[in-house]
């Protein structure tokens, strides 16, 4: 038969269902989930580029294996979850795509291993444990539809990345326990892990024509910091899991945050806020989970509530009890009380 095998698989109904699944999942993905390039793309990843080792401490390995009950699939799910959260924090994007090889089947040859583009939408309000369970379902769904050829999927999607020969993902993650080595798909970074008894060892292969080693070292350091914090406290919301090292925290919070300014004596907090709202009305003032307010929106909401409080008899020498869960409404209420001339008394909602 003259046609290659992947071409005749269109007659397979299961394969058509797989194609529809992947097209539906990836049709709206327009940007690669990757790091900022140090250099213009100068060649695709070819497996013979630079390599950096990943050092997972004995304590981290023990916590990971305990969290995943020593299961290789759940171990991979945990690594994938941490990687996606790290990329979400780096890029600011809610939709993150990471590459994975097809899951290894018993007796399967490693001559041709399909690539899968694993896409997820991240919500900062989810806990790491909740996202871990979500990621588990995403991976199970993907691996149950892993036969549809990656090269055909790129052609099916017909967006600029596919037409220009760029991949659907730029970072791939593999675990030797459940994967063969993936065929070359054009990605620039591949994170690979092996489990040896009670230790987990990792390495990163990356395109040195695109990334400087320092960039990859910094990113993998953040990945490990985030992974350590997540497995230590799986109930933490993914938007608040720390990933900076202590020296980086000091630089950001102290060295880069030298924002001392002379403020006229007697100036109130809400007056400073109003001045800032006048200077940058459309700038982001408050963000909590999926809620955001610009300075203009926050000022307008606070003014409306302040007028209501004043009409209700609130003013100087008045104390207003405030019992609200953390949200943008909490900031609106704080500003409104101050604008009315009163003081607020915070009460724990629980």
Where are these regions (language model features)?
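Low-complexity, glycine/alanine/valine/leucine- and proline-rich hydrophobic stretches
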Residues: 181-198
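Short amphipathic alpha-helices and their capping loops
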Residues: 1-50, 169, 175-176, 249-261, ...
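Short amphipathic alpha-helical/adjacent loop interface patches that line ligand
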Residues: 19, 83, 136, 220-224, ...
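Carrier-protein-dependent adenylate-forming modules in NRPS/ANL systems
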Residues: 1-5, 36-37, 62, 90, ...
